[in-house]
């Protein structure tokens, strides 16, 4: 009878434990939730994610991990992942710095300094992970033939701390990059406004010159200049609408517009000079002929005056 009661009690307790285990589902690790928040798909973040996944695998300290830790396989893999991450991060940072050109120098310098410090912290964290694994390999090789259980426990504890610090610094870097990107977007918008303000007077000046000189050179030239001015204004409006996303393209188009304005102004000046030369060639012969006729008339008048002034001979002797 006691055996039966004992069997029933064990069965009851086992059923209760099974219900408790089914009711409590494991929640994802806080680190995994935080990692998912800052990974937005940028190339440097994807590279850092590969480094992170490899570090999680190393932290399991499985038999395969322990075998590869005794060689240089793990450190070589980590080095390659570190280099890839820093390369992608540097490229992304350079891209943002190019977009920050219209921003004030003081603001750009401050953002660059903060981002550089955050990037250095992340690189130092990754370097600490690699250095700790190299140290572990040396310690294990020194204790060859002895128990390394204590070394593995210390390594596991240290790797957990390094992972937390790495995740914290990666999150900080991602936030600073977001601020950096917001500054670049704001600078691009300011740059568009500044470009429009600078080009507006140039376009208007070109239109006025075309109207003034074209009235001398002829009506067709004026019509061509006005049509070109209309096309230029339409082109500038089209460029202004797309500048926010393609600031580099706007810079190239600005240079092209300025070159066209200078070329058109030069052509107008040359046409005005040619017109002036034609006018001069028309009137110079007429002026010279008038001068010759005037000189001949003066000579005739002088001759006539001289003849009338001569003395008349007397008849008395």
UniProtKB/Swiss-Prot annotation:
Where are the stretches annotated Specificity for association with VLDL? 278-290
Modification Methionine sulfoxide occurs at: 143
- Main localization is secreted
Sites where the protein binds heparin: 162-165, 229-236
Stretches of the chain forming a coiled coil according to its record: none
8 X 22 AA approximate tandem repeats: region residues: 80-255
Task: Name the keywords, alphabetized.
Answer: Chylomicron, Endosome, Extracellular matrix, Glycoprotein, HDL, Heparin-binding, Lipid transport, Lipid-binding, Oxidation, Phosphoprotein, Repeat, Secreted, Signal, Transport, VLDL
Does Repeat appear among the keywords? yes
Give me the ranges of the annotated region Homooligomerization. 266-317
Signal sequence range: 1-18
Q: Describe its PTM?
A: APOE exists as multiple glycosylated and sialylated glycoforms within cells and in plasma. The extent of glycosylation and sialylation are tissue and context specific. Glycated in plasma VLDL.
Q: What does this protein do?
A: APOE is an apolipoprotein, a protein associating with lipid particles, that mainly functions in lipoprotein-mediated lipid transport between organs via the plasma and interstitial fluids. APOE is a core component of plasma lipoproteins and is involved in their production, conversion and clearance. Apolipoproteins are amphipathic molecules that interact both with lipids of the lipoprotein particle core and the aqueous environment of the plasma.
| Official protein name in the record | Apolipoprotein E
Taxonomic lineage is:
Eukaryota, Metazoa, Chordata, Craniata, Vertebrata
């Amino acid at each position: 009878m006691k055996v039966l009661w004992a069997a029933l009690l064990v069965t009851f307790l086992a059923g209760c434990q099974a219900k408790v285990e089914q009711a409590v589902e494991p929640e994802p690790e806080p680190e995994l939730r935080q990692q998912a928040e800052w990974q937005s798909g940028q190339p440097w973040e994807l590279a850092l994610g590969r480094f992170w996944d490899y570090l999680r695998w190393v932290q399991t300290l499985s038999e395969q991990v322990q075998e590869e830790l005794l060689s240089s396989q793990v450190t070589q893999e980590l080095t390659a992942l570190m280099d890839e991450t820093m390369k992608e991060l540097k490229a992304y940072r350079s891209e943002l710095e190019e977009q920050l050109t219209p921003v004030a120098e003081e603001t750009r310098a401050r953002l660059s300094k903060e981002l550089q410090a955050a990037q250095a912290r992340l690189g130092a964290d990754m370097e600490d992970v690699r250095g700790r694994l190299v140290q572990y390999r040396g310690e294990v090789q020194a204790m060859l033939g002895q128990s390394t259980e204590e070394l593995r426990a210390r390594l596991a504890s240290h790797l957990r701390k390094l992972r937390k610090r790495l995740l914290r610094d990666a999150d900080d870097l991602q936030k600073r990059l977001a601020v950096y990107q917001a500054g670049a977007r704001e600078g691009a918008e300011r740059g568009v406004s500044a470009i429009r303000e600078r080009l507006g007077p140039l376009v208007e000046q070109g239109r006025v010159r075309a109207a003034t000189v074209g009235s001398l050179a002829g009506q067709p030239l004026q019509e061509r200049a006005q049509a070109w001015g209309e096309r230029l204004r339409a082109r500038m409006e089209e460029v202004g609408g797309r500048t926010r996303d393609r600031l580099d393209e706007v810079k190239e188009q600005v240079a092209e517009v300025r070159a066209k304005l200078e070329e058109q102004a030069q052509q107008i000046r040359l046409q005005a000079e040619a017109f002036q030369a034609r006018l001069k060639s028309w009137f110079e012969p007429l002026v010279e002929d008038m001068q010759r006729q005037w000189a001949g008339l003066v000579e005739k008048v002088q001759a006539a005056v001289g003849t009338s002034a001569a003395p008349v001979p007397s008849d008395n002797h």
